[in-house]
Design a protein with these regions (language model features):
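Hydrophobic, membrane-embedded alpha-helices of multi-pass small-molecule transporters
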Residues: 9-27, 46-47, 135-138, 195-259, ...
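Transmembrane helix-loop boundary segments of multi-pass membrane transporters
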Residues: 30-41, 115-128, 150-162, 290, ...
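Hydrophobic transmembrane alpha-helices that form the core helical bundles
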Residues: 34, 52-139, 143-147, 296-316, ...
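Hydrophobic alpha-helical segments and their helix-loop junctions in multi-pass secondary transporters
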Residues: 114, 163-194, 253-260
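Helix-loop-helix connectors at the membrane interface of multi-pass transporters/channels
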Residues: 2-4, 77, 104-133, 167, ...
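Membrane-interface loop-to-helix entry segments
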Residues: 131-183, 215, 238-243, 360
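Membrane-interface "cap" regions at the ends of multi-pass membrane proteins
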Residues: 1-60, 65-69
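TM-loop-TM module centered on a large, flexible mid-protein loop between adjacent transmembrane helices
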Residues: 74-75, 81, 113-120, 239-304, ...
């Protein structure tokens, strides 16, 4: 039993999907849809100057240190010393811990929209106690799956990434194409400027948010020792993931902007509303609860990827002697159980995430 977790290997496709689920969150599409055609400029610009260079560096460092575990802790530590390596993995871990409530709130909204009564669904989605309960349930479910080891994490992340992110994104894009091809009215002006006006502060804010959208492609480096032939397969997985990410963001944003008027875009609920509008157009409203369930599953997969990733890097820090023995404890299959438990407690006990949820 002790060696089960160590013998599991990730294939190119599984790691690519894990990278996509770590980076892509469909909940962010409404925020960019309000900027129309110029949103594509931001996506492509950020991909060229941030996503692709980050992916190249991650692929190179993962291949260089394929026999050493730790991800950014190892990469930064080898170049600048273990103290800065610890700082790098700590920042990655703590920012993901604070980020969980944001993405999990979208999961709660998705579950609320499983019903067919949209006024009631919206009322439930805005209930802060319902949201808090769902956030904690999804997060701890992800934690317990992580405790089952990399085999479970890989399978759930791959299936969840396909069912909850890639397939819904592809469906959204196809629905947008069908809508336009059959004479549907586009709420997005495709004759507007592709290049944004940088004299407006709002456009600078959007540029910053797009860079944040692409954060996380390096996180897969944590699992480099768990990849078959990492020097060859890890770079493949990174670039496949990067390509899928850009396509989903650009075309998905367009599809959402086409079906929802700019004035009606809501950052939390518009993705579900967009699907609802498309389904009504093709007379298939019965698909709305199904897509809501799929999106909630996608949230679980995305959170699972981050729960299992940076915590493993913190575990590598502990094994290097920079944390007390308590942080080095594992379960019988070698999973960093104490770090996962502490991470879960921080989600609720930290004032920022908890107060943010209860103040909705």
């Amino acid at each position: 039993m002790a060696n089960i977790n160590k013998t599991v290997k990730l294939g190119v496709f599984t790691l690519a999907i894990m990278n996509v689920t770590a980076v892509v969150s469909l909940r962010g599409l409404p925020a960019e849809a309000v900027y129309g055609l110029s949103s594509a400029f931001y996506y492509l610009f950020a991909a060229i100057v941030f996503l692709i260079p980050t992916s190249l560096v991650a692929a190179e460092l993962a291949a260089m240190f394929q026999d050493k575990q730790g991800g950014v802790f190892r990469w930064v530590g080898e170049a600048y010393g273990k103290r800065l390596g610890f700082l790098a993995i700590w920042v990655q871990w703590i920012e993901s811990t604070i980020w969980y409530p944001t993405v999990l709130t979208f999961g709660a909204v998705s579950i609320a929209f499983i019903g067919m009564d949209h006024p009631e669904d919206m009322l439930l989605a805005n209930n802060k106690y319902y949201t808090l309960a769902i956030v904690l349930i999804i997060y701890w479910l992800a934690t317990f799956i992580s405790l089952k080891g990399l085999s479970w994490v890989g399978k759930v992340a791959k299936i969840g990434g396909m069912v909850g992110t890639i397939i819904p994104a592809a469906l959204l894009i196809i629905l947008g194409i069908v809508y336009l091809a059959t004479g549907g009215h586009s709420n997005m002006d495709f004759h507007s400027n592709f290049f944004p006006d940088f004299s407006k502060f709002d456009n600078l804010v959007l540029a910053a948010s797009i860079f944040l959208f692409y954060a996380g492609m390096e996180m897969g480096g944590i699992h480099v020792k768990d990849v078959d032939n990492p020097s060859k397969n890890y770079p493949k997985a990174v670039f496949i993931g990067a390509l899928i990410t850009v396509v989903i963001f650009v075309l998905g944003t367009f599809a959402l902007g086409i079906i929802i008027p700019e004035k009606d875009i809501n950052l939390t609920q518009s993705l579900l509303v967009g699907f609802d509008n498309y389904f009504k157009y093709i007379h298939a409203s019965w698909l709305s609860p199904i897509i809501a369930i799929a999106l909630a599953f996608g949230v679980l997969a995305g959170v699972l990827t981050w729960v299992a990733g940076p915590s493993k890097g913190i575990f590598a820090v502990g094994k290097a002697g920079y944390l007390p023995p308590f942080f080095q404890k594992t379960n019988k299959i070698g999973v960093q159980k104490n770090i996962l438990y502490i991470q879960g407690c921080l989600l609720y006990t930290s004032p920022s995430p908890r107060d943010g949820l209860l103040s909705r």
